[in-house]
C-alpha cells in the first residue's frame, strides 16, 4: 500500500476486464485427446506459475478439437489467472510467447482488458501480490469463484 501513498483509487476486476471461463462442456478434452505436439497448446496449471508462463511440460489439442471448443481461447495481451488448486498464479500472453494458439483449462480464467490503455505490467504486479486467501472457498481443493473474482478491488495510482 505504501506504493501509492494516499492517492489511490480502487477498481473492481469486473470493471477492468472481461472474465472468460474455459469451455467445460461435452467437448472438454479427455486425456487421450492431449498430445505432446499439435495445433493448440492446452494450458494446465503447471504452465501458469507465480512467475508467469512455464512451458516445461506441454499438452496440445488438434485443430479439430480447438474448433469444437467455444470459449477459453487466448488473444494477445490477455492475462491468465489460476482459480483452482493453486489460486492466484498469473501469466501474461504478450508477443514474447511464441505459441499462436492457446486455450485455458477448467482451473483458470482469462482476464481480457476492457480498455486498451491499461498498464498491464502494473496490473500483473498487483494481481500477483494480491491476497486471495480472503476470497477462496473450499479446503481440499481451494477455488476462486468468478462471482468473488469480479468483486476484487485493485489499487491504482491516482
Positions of predicted regions on the chain:
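Specificity-determining recognition surfaces
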Residues: 126-154
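Non-catalytic DNA-recognition/assembly elements of restriction-modification systems
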Residues: 1-26, 151, 155-158
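A short beta-sheet element
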Residues: 44, 64-128, 145
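Short, solvent-exposed loop/turn elements at beta->coil junctions and helix N-caps
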Residues: 29-32, 96-97, 139-142
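Short, solvent-exposed beta-strand edge segments and adjacent coil->beta transition regions
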Residues: 58, 106-108, 149-151
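Structured loops at beta-to-helix junctions and adjacent beta-edge loops in soluble globular domains
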Residues: 16, 45-46, 114, 157
Amino acid at each position: 500500500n505504501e506504493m501509492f501513498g494516499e492517492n489511490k483509487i480502487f477498481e473492481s476486476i469486473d470493471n477492468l476486464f472481461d472474465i472468460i471461463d474455459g469451455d467445460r462442456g461435452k467437448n472438454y478434452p479427455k486425456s487421450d485427446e492431449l498430445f505432446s505436439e499439435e495445433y493448440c497448446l492446452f494450458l494446465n496449471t503447471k504452465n501458469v506459475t507465480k512467475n508467469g508462463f512455464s512451458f516445461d511440460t506441454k499438452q496440445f489439442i488438434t485443430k479439430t478439437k480447438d474448433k469444437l471448443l467455444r470459449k477459453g481461447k487466448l488473444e494477445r495481451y490477455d492475462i491468465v489467472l489460476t482459480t483452482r488448486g493453486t489460486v492466484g498464479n498469473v501469466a501474461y500472453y504478450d508477443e514474447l510467447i511464441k505459441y499462436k494458439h492457446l486455450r485455458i483449462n477448467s482451473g483458470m480464467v482469462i482476464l481480457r482488458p476492457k480498455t486498451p490503455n491499461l498498464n498491464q505490467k502494473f496490473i500483473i504486479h498487483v494481481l500477483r501480490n494480491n491476497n486471495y486467501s480472503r476470497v477462496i472457498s473450499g479446503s481440499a481443493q481451494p477455488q476462486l469463484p468468478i462471482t468473488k473474482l469480479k468483486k476484487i478491488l485493485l489499487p491504482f495510482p491516482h
